[in-house]
Every structure is written in structure tokens, then in C-alpha cells.
Amino acid sequence: MYVSNLRLSNYRSWEELDLQLSPGITIFSGPNGHGKTNIVEALGYLAHLSSHRVNSDAALVRRGEEIANISATAVNNGRELTAHLAIRARGSNRAHINRAAMNSQRDLLGVVRTTLFSPEDLALIRGEPEQRRHFLDAIMVARYPRLAAVKADYDKALRQRNALLRQSAFALRLVVGAPKGASHNLSEDIKADAESALATLDVWDSQLAALGAQIMSARVQIVHDLAPHLQQTYQSLAPQSRPAHMSYTSTIDVELADLGIRLGVSEPNQPTALLSPEIAEATLLQAFANKRPQEVERGTTLLGPHRDDVNLILGHQPAKGYASHGESWSFALSLRLAAFFMQRGDGVEPVVILDDVFAELDSSRRQHLVDLISSAEQVLITAAVDEDIPEALRDVAKIYTIDELKNSALSTAERAVKDGEADGD
């Protein structure tokens, strides 16, 4: 897959941009703060419906405007599709494929695929579990687009279950974990409230287990498929370092281990386990029942994929806290490259985006990275200064300076104004 055209209007610093792209390597060069990252961020947003830099869509809309537009034409095995997204500072976004309106922006998932690495990815190694869950979920919805709706439904059900645990805490505590027969001493009204809350909690348990099981099973499959690519790419980037490995860890690991399923594997050469949705659902449902007194007491959901994590192992130690700065960078970059090679194996090769990456790598790692990306159909790179561009790329890459792109956009806008004036005459 490659992107042949990218158009932006009122997206962050870009009032207008109409960019023709081709397979191969394209580099956007310019000082920090001048808009080069905004270009690749926009393409990444179209692919994943989220930004790697901010959580709020409002930040993506140019100051003083209400709507930002992103359009990209993707070419996959000779077939062209154009994805268009109107991002609203307030209200719901609007999506089109070619000229057809979509019911949801989630319908765009899979039209454009990207693997984006940026300095923020260091948080994959050093940050909190939420960062690693987000990494897996971005791959999940690209690989299995229908699970985007499952994830949204899970998040909604989780909020409602937590609200029930908080709002009905008094009634639930009277019956959950209480001695047998104690409910006989309760008034009819309180007993009715407690029974209603319990029945509703049972419903949310079932929904959360069914939805969460699909997410867990997909994540475990992704980790299983990523692990060998991670080992290979890390070995290529840092041949003198310890071997890298990854495994999935869940809040129901103990229950799964009782069934003979051990997700957490710390040895680099051992394959990670798989988990079927059916087993995950049954195990989650039983775990909810066992954990109910603690959840009622604390007023929150203690089990499920929203609390899971990924073990990132370097040698025999966790990468978090034990990896050096250089090893952490290489590990984070290897995770992104592993995702690229895995998706290539699936039959749909994503566009590789490297946002200000080479500035953080020594000459040896730069060359290893160039070797790894040389076979990709399309690579988009940003660099703040020319010195950050590896020599091996200078003769083969198309290099745009941000000033060139801004001047081109300005000329296009001026022509449009003149054409409008001519039409008025």
C-alpha cells in the first residue's frame, strides 16, 4: 500500500496542503514547530482515528476554524480508495470513502494503514500500561476493523458497570458478602433495591465478559504474532544487546494458569500462548463472580482487558527500569517495525512513518534502520536538520522542505482566489 495524495485544510498549522506522493522514501525537512509532524500526524490519524500527540480532536483544528479536513488516496494492489474525514472542534466527525458518506468514522479503518514511530513511543517502554494497551489496540482495529466497535462497546459497558458499582454501593454491600439469611432483616424497599442492583450487575458482567474476551483474544494473538518479528528487528537494530521478547499479562492469569494456559512467557525463544474468546469469556465471567465482594467494596471493575499489560523483556529483565536509553529507543522502534512486518505478512503492507527518529540514533543504529525500511513500499520521514538524514537516503529519497510546501500551498490559495475573482467578473 502507498498513499498517492494527501490533502489537508485547516489542520493544525496547515490552512491548505495538497501533496502528491509516490512509492519509495519521502522526507519532510524543516525546523521544529513549522508543521512537518502535522503532515504525518494527519495521515496517522486517518489510519487509526487517533493522534499520537494529543487526546482531543479540538487540538487538531486550526485556530479560529470549526472543521479540519483530511483526505488521502491509498493505492493497494492497483485499487484506489480515497478516505476523507472532517474533524469537528465540537460535535461528531464526518467520514466519506470516495464520495459515499459513512455511518461512522470507524468505517474508514483499513482504507489507509500506517506504522508510525515518534519520540513519544519511548513511553511504550518507560510509561504506564495504558500506553502499551493503546499500542496493541491500534494494531487490533487495523487488523480486525470490526473490533473497533467491540472496543467502543466495551468501554461504554465498563463506564456503566463502574457507575452501578458506585451508585448502588450501599444496597450492594448489604447483600454481597453478607452472612446467609442476613437479608431477612432488611426492609422490603432496601431488599428490592439490592436485588435490582444485583440483577443489573449480572447483566453487565455478562456483557463485559463477552466483549472483553474478544479484545483479550485478539490482543493475545497479536502479541503471539509480533513476538518473533520483535526479536528479529531488535537483533538487527542492536546486535550487541540482549535479546528482546514480549508477552501478554492479564488480570485473570491465575485462573487461566489453572486451565493450563500461561500467557506470560519470559524466555525469548519460547512461543507465547494463545487464548480463545470462548475460554476468555468463561474465565472472565467466573472471575467477576469471585471478585464481586472486592469490586463492590472498592466501587470499580478490577478485572478485564482495561487493566491488562504487555511484558517487554530484555534478556531476563523487564525493559522498563533496566534498559538503557539507547536500548529503550531500539526496543520501542523494534515494536513499531515488528507491527509493520507482521501486517506485511497479513497481506496489507502499511505506510512506514518515522517522525524525527534519526536524531535519536547513533550512526550504527541509523544504518541498521535504513536497511530494515529499504524494502517498504512507502516510507515517510521527518527531520529537523539535514544532518539527521542518513547519507544512504539522500540520493534515493524525495526531499521536501517545509518552506517549499508552504510556498506551494500559498501559491495554490492565491490561484484559487484569482480564479474566484475571474469567475465573478
From Swiss-Prot:
The keyword Transferase does not apply. Signal peptide: none annotated. Transmembrane segments: none annotated. InterPro entries: DNA-binding_RecF, DNA-binding_RecF_CS, P-loop_NTPase, RecF/RecN/SMC_N, RecF_2. Keywords: ATP-binding, Cytoplasm, DNA damage, DNA repair, DNA replication, DNA-binding, Nucleotide-binding, SOS response. One of its GO terms (cellular component) is cytoplasm. It holds the Pfam family SMC_N. GO terms for biological process: DNA replication; DNA synthesis involved in DNA repair; double-strand break repair; SOS response. One of its GO terms (molecular function) is ATP binding. It is found in: Cytoplasm. ATP binds at residues 30-37. Its main location: cytoplasm. It comes from the Bacteria. PANTHER family: DNA REPLICATION AND REPAIR PROTEIN RECF. The RecF protein is involved in DNA metabolism; it is required for DNA replication and normal SOS inducibility. RecF binds preferentially to single-stranded, linear DNA. It also seems to bind ATP. Belongs to the RecF family. This is DNA replication and repair protein RecF. The lineage of its organism: Bacteria, Bacillati, Actinomycetota, Actinomycetes, Mycobacteriales.
